[in-house]
Amino acid sequence: MKSLFTLLAAFVVLQAQSQTEKWDLKRCVEYAVEHNISVKQADIQARIAAIQAKQSKLAVYPSVSGSSGLGMRFGRSIDPTTNAFSTTQFLYQNFGLSGGMQLYNYGSLKNSATVADLNAKAALTDVDKIANDISLSVANFYLTVLAAAEQVKITQVQIGQTLTQLEITKKRVDAGALPELNLAEIQVQLASDSSNYIAAYTGYEQNILNLQGLLNLDPAVPFEVATPNINTIPIPSFAELQPAMVYEMALGTQPLQKANAIRLEAAKKSVMVAKAQQYPTISVGGNLASNFSNSFKKTTGASFLGYGPAVPGYDSKVSIAGQDYYVQSPMYKINQTNRNISEIWDGWSKQLSNNFGQNIGFNVSIPIFNAGQAKASYQRANLNVKNVELQKEQADVTLKQNIYTAYNNATAALQKLNASTKAVETAQKAYDFASKRYEVGLLSSLDLITNQNNLLRAKVQQLSNQYDYIFKMEVLEFYKGQGVKF
């Protein structure tokens, strides 16, 4: 028995030392939405969709690109400036600027930009949906923690009552008014109450860990929730939460319904994009270009070497009046030296000016036959519209079913709460009468323990029903689009 009291004292000390900052529901929800991995992933997808939407809007503007090249050529090659074959080493450089723009394609670019923008908006509503789902889950886990904490308190009160009974019974046994069996029965009950307390406290800690996991918090960090007054939690009347009214509001407030409406609009615009593939495309394009080249060697003059055959390797001759005459031509040696770095770039600006060229042109592409791809794309786009419409309809039907189910669950929860409240009142009266009869020796300790356990079970059940009722009413509020309010 002494070890039992020591164990109970240790649990009480652990609770007393829990002085960490307490988290209320609002803080839990905000933290979960900000740090939950699923919310982060949805947010990344929304940002990607926003980038795609921005890029699609810019596609209607002209595309412009510039280019430049610098290099050296060796051996036999074509000089890009003179277009003549050359065997000397030379430096070359070129510049270019080109651009193009689509002028007409049955609104393909504009409609594509609209589709991308709608998809970006739908992705944002996906983030809201996941955040809403996380908020509702946090509220459920939070209420579960509160219920577990209250259950710990109930078991503590139970232990206190049993300890009081133990003290009274021990005195009466010592006085010879009761047999020792009564004392043994109370001691057994105290051990049972202690076991219930330990189980309740362990369940509370496990629920705390579950909530930390949902919040993506480190389990090693101390964490405790704030306990609001359960009687001050605002609960609307059923008149404000009639399922037909809640459903009409939910159609305009629930993120999934918003996303479905947006995606249906995007699917219809995608039909126009697919249809554009069957129409001609008119585009305009042009470019500006210039180049420069220069040999690594420069000519400094020529040296006269004498005369030689007009055609090297052949004795060229002509006959005049029967007399042969040999034809010779002067021979020269071209003198060249290497250019230095500054000389290589001689005439750079002049060459670029002389070689500057421009062109502009229009292009018309008319789809004649493409293996039925354009027609198939158009048909798929129309079928996709019907598919999205069915998805939207199914989601609305599911929403309506969920709302009516939530309303029925809330009604049943209220009935269970009322019944359990009456059960507590009855059990409390029975226990009070039993305690008085036990004090005067008109009731056995076993009967007293039975009444005490009945009261404990009634209180635990009432507590569970109360938090269950609050959560189910919050679910209805959630469908109205008002979020978690306590």
Language-model features: locations:
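Periplasmic alpha-helical coiled-coil/stalk elements that build and connect Gram-negative outer-membrane
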Residues: 133-249, 409, 413, 433, ...
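Hydrophobic, lipid-facing positions within transmembrane beta-strands of outer-membrane proteins
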Residues: 93-99, 246, 358-364
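Acidic, low-complexity, intrinsically disordered peripheral segments
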Residues: 74, 219, 296-306, 340-344, ...
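Transmembrane beta-strands of outer-membrane beta-barrel pores
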Residues: 70-74, 103, 288-292, 366-368, ...
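Short segments within alpha-helical structural elements
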Residues: 44, 58, 195-217, 421-482
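Bacterial Sec-pathway N-terminal export signals of envelope proteins
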Residues: 18-69, 75, 219, 226-272, ...
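Sec/SRP-type N-terminal targeting helices
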Residues: 40-44, 57-58, 89, 103-131, ...
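Bacterial Sec-dependent N-terminal signal peptides
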Residues: 1-25, 36, 484-486
